[in-house]
């Protein structure tokens, strides 16, 4: 998934950047991006002059840009096998190219130090210059350890260079020119925490209204296979994890609604959003970028980057507008549990149009097997294991968003769990197979679950938990409203909501 791609900048390419740079909003004393890119030139004289200019005008807000360069200098061997310009276009091999870079992946975020034996390699020389310069400016001694640099950087408060986003867009464009359409406009998050996930724009193929079949015809599924169940307006559908994990995104129609079903495999969330913004139909796709290990989508109208977990715009023209994607409820459960509850359900078939190993547990097997993260995040919390599953809820209040995480293990041991949170009386009902559904309790007190799986209140009355309502047997026409909630890995939820409350640690 994460493949190395050589990266070379030449003086010709640097000049091209200077011609492309927007100048509005840049103070007179701010070095232009041509200076930053010249600092990694193969021309030692030009690089020295650029670094002297940066030194004379240095402020902490320039450090993240230099750290970006350290990442892209990490190319391994073959420094001169391909030359790429800042916008992703090829530069001829005789144009004086310089540095290189590649996709980070685990230990490969460190530059191969054995390459420093070859002092004539222009990329090695550029790396040494940038690292030495950054160490002198910051007083840090991280050498070629990119992860150490960015972990340190995340602890710093600084005013970024006004064209930092433009620099990122042009660096990433060496892997896919489409990255240039991002990073325009405002940002609601720190740009130094937005990183490339190792795939091009749209590089993980989405499922476009995938074919479905009935429960009786889905012989490829075992009862213990994990599915994500969604119900809209009385229509039920199961999205098997073994399929969705390979695609991370499905555009679908269910119950008369157009849906964007997004699966962030890294942070463990499946959220079916309505495919509209402000009442207008909008198509979302995979950007190839992450924020704190959370998959970022982009809309095809404005090219704004959206958090797949919060449903909010984070970088681009839509930031600052009062817009947010509308989530629908989803449950994580077994195929046996889902089809028993909804015998009329439809389910995705294996006829996706793609060649993948759709056996249970094949996708991301190594990642799911350990508690290790594929991409570091700036904030973590040790009260639970990184990939411990939690049920995630959030509510808007007058003082902002209130976030709540409830351990899935806690809910499995307390299958009827009631709590007052953010001024709301909530009850979480959990099936024996672990499917969690949340309802507005509305003043009722719920105490237990009987042998038939019905919820029992403090008066001894029984209730049935369905996909829309918690319905009293005494009045099948009534019921308590179900609220959107979804599973997530603890680290992924905490990284987005570090002020979250946690129950069940």
Region roles according to the model:
Residues 47-51, 126-134:
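Conserved hydrophobic register position within alpha-solenoid helical repeats
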Residues 28-38, 59-81, 143-148:
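Amphipathic alpha-helical scaffolding segments comprising HEAT/armadillo-like alpha-solenoid repeats
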Residues 67-73, 93, 98-120, 132-505:
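Mid-to-C-terminal functional-domain signal that highlights helix-capping/loop sites
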Residues 2-12:
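Bacterial N-terminal signal peptides that target proteins for export
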Residues 44-45, 75-79, 124, 128, ...:
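Alpha-helix N-cap/helix-start positions at coil->helix boundaries
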Residues 54-61, 134, 138:
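Alpha-solenoid repeat junctions
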Residues 10-21:
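Bacterial N-terminal signal peptides
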Residues 23-27:
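Sec/Tat signal peptide C-region and signal peptidase I cleavage site
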């Amino acid at each position: 998934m994460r493949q190395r791609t050589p990266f070379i900048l030449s003086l010709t390419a640097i000049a091209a950047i200077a011609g492309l740079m927007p100048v509005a909003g840049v103070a007179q004393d701010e070095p232009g991006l041509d200076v930053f890119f010249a600092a990694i030139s193969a021309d030692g004289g030009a690089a020295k002059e650029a670094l002297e200019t940066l030194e004379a005008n240095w402020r902490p807000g320039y450090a993240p840009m230099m750290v970006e360069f350290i990442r892209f200098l990490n190319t391994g061997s073959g420094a001169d096998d391909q030359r790429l310009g800042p916008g992703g276009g090829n530069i001829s091999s005789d144009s004086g190219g310089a540095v290189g870079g590649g996709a980070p992946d685990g230990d490969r975020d460190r530059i191969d130090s054995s390459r420093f034996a070859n002092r004539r390699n222009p990329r090695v020389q550029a790396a040494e210059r940038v690292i030495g310069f950054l160490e002198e400016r910051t007083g840090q001694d991280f050498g070629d350890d990119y992860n150490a640099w960015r972990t340190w950087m995340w602890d710093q408060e600084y005013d970024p260079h006004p064209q930092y986003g433009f620099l990122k867009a042009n660096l990433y464009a060496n892997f896919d020119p489409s990255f240039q359409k991002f990073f325009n406009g405002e940002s609601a998050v720190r740009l130094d925490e937005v990183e490339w996930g190792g795939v091009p724009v749209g590089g993980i193929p989405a499922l476009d209204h995938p074919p479905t079949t009935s429960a009786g015809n889905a012989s490829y599924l075992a009862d213990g296979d994990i599915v994500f169940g969604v119900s809209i307006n009385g229509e039920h559908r199961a999205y098997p994890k073994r399929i969705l994990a390979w695609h991370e995104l499905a555009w679908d129609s269910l119950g008369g609604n157009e849906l964007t079903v997004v699966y962030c495999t890294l942070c463990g969330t499946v959220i079916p959003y309505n495919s509209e913004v402000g009442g207008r139909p909008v198509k979302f796709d995979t950007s190839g970028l992450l924020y704190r290990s959370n998959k970022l989508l982009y809309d095809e109208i404005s090219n704004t980057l959206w958090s797949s977990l919060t449903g909010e715009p984070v970088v681009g023209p839509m930031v600052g507008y009062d817009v947010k994607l509308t989530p629908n409820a989803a449950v994580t459960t077994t195929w046996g549990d889902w089809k028993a509850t909804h015998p009329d359900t439809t389910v995705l078939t294996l006829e996706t149009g793609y060649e993948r190993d759709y056996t249970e547990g094949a996708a991301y097997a190594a990642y799911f097997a350990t508690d290790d993260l594929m991409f570091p995040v700036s904030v973590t919390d040790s009260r639970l294991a990184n990939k411990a599953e939690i049920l995630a809820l959030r509510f808007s209040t007058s003082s902002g968003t209130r976030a709540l995480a409830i351990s899935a293990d806690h809910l499995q041991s307390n299958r009827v769990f009631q709590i007052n949170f953010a001024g709301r009386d909530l009850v979480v009902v959990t099936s024996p197979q672990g499917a969690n559904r949340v309802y507005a309790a509305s003043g009722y007190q719920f105490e237990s679950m009987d042998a038939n799986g019905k919820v029992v209140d403090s008066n001894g009355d029984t209730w049935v938990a369905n996909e829309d309502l918690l319905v009293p047997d005494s009045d099948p026409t009534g019921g308590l409203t179900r609220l959107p909630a979804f599973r997530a890995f603890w680290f992924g939820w905490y990284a987005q909501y570090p002020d979250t409350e946690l129950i069940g640690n």
